[in-house]
Regions:
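Acidic, polar ligand-binding/catalytic clefts
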Residues: 75, 87-150, 216-223
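Extracytoplasmic small-molecule ligand-binding "clamshell" domains
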Residues: 32-33, 40-110
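Extended ligand-binding regions for polar small-molecule ligands
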Residues: 71-73, 80, 145, 149, ...
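Periplasmic-binding protein-like
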Residues: 51, 131-142, 206-249, 266-267
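A ligand-binding cleft/hinge motif common to bilobed small-molecule-binding domains
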Residues: 97, 113-123, 166-172, 192-226
Length: 267
């Protein structure tokens, strides 16, 4: 009888040890400070993207689905981390909202025509560059504007918190002209302002402008300030940044990145 009691006690002790070990493991998992481990536990990647930039991130009005090169790139990152390209949730952002949403932790990363600058590197960590562009200018085709200097004293529509204004200011200084600026939250708003005559020109990166080019408009030939696009993550999140960079490196090596760019008319 005593032998059975000892066996019972030992058995219960083993169960307790296993249970306790499991609880500690679960607790350790719950309190993990590794951002990538927390991300994997969450089971999906939350990404800030544009929904008003044809070819990069644009909401298809027929399907309601967000499409574009940066959408495909984000799915590739999700596949690298989770083994499933659909383990991703997209949140629309603008140039003004993308940084704050990343800071608060609502987003894991931002893939939204985000130009990498030395100033921005102080606030966020950026991936290796995946696309290079330059600032361009769109005007009405029936306007008298043929060159950048023709815009002296005129009003340019730009996006809030974008690098465009600073790039144009430098260009205007070099050209010896003065520009006025009107800032808008979204690109469609700037295009409407141009069409209605409230502004004289619409300026942003060339690839973005090209998505808004219609028969009634034209692009000036001048380009300003090279724009290097990178994926942004919260400052110090090196684990996620490494995963993003590994994804980009793999896509470049395999030729898939070029294929993606060609698919969306960016190459």
């Amino acid at each position: 009888m005593r032998k059975h009691s000892i066996k019972t006690i030992v058995g219960l002790a083993l169960i307790l040890v296993c249970t306790t070990t499991g609880l500690f493991a679960a607790g350790a998992k719950e309190t993990s400070t590794d951002p990538l481990a927390q991300l994997k536990a969450k089971g999906k990647l939350t990404v800030g993207c544009k929904v008003d930039v044809p070819s990069f991130g644009y909401k298809n009005i027929n399907t309601g689905v967000i499409e574009g090169f940066e959408i495909d790139l984000s799915k590739a990152v999700a596949k690298h981390i989770f083994g499933d390209e659909n383990a991703v949730e997209f949140t629309p952002v603008t140039a003004k909202t993308r940084g704050p949403l990343l800071d608060t932790g609502e987003l894991d990363m931002v893939a939204a025509t985000f130009t990498v600058t030395e100033e921005r590197k102080n606030s966020w960590d950026f991936s290796t560059i995946y696309y290079v562009d330059a600032v361009a200018i769109m005007v009405k085709k029936d306007s008298s504007f043929a060159t950048f200097k023709d815009l002296d004293g005129k009003t340019i529509g730009v996006a809030q918190s974008a690098t465009t204004k600073k790039s144009l200011e430098a260009g205007a200084k070099d050209a010896g002209i003065t520009l006025k600026y009107s800032e808008y939250a979204t690109y469609p708003e700037i295009k409407v302002a141009l069409d209605s005559g409230r502004i004289d020109a619409f300026s942003v990166d060339f690839a973005i402008l090209n998505g808004y080019l219609e028969d009634s408009c034209k692009l000036l030939s001048e380009r300003f300030a090279k724009q290097d696009y990178g994926i942004a993550v919260k400052k110090g999140n090196t684990a996620l940044l490494d995963a993003v960079n590994s994804t980009i490196a793999d896509l470049k090596k395999s030729g898939e990145l070029d294929a993606m760019l060609s698919k969306w008319g960016l190459k």
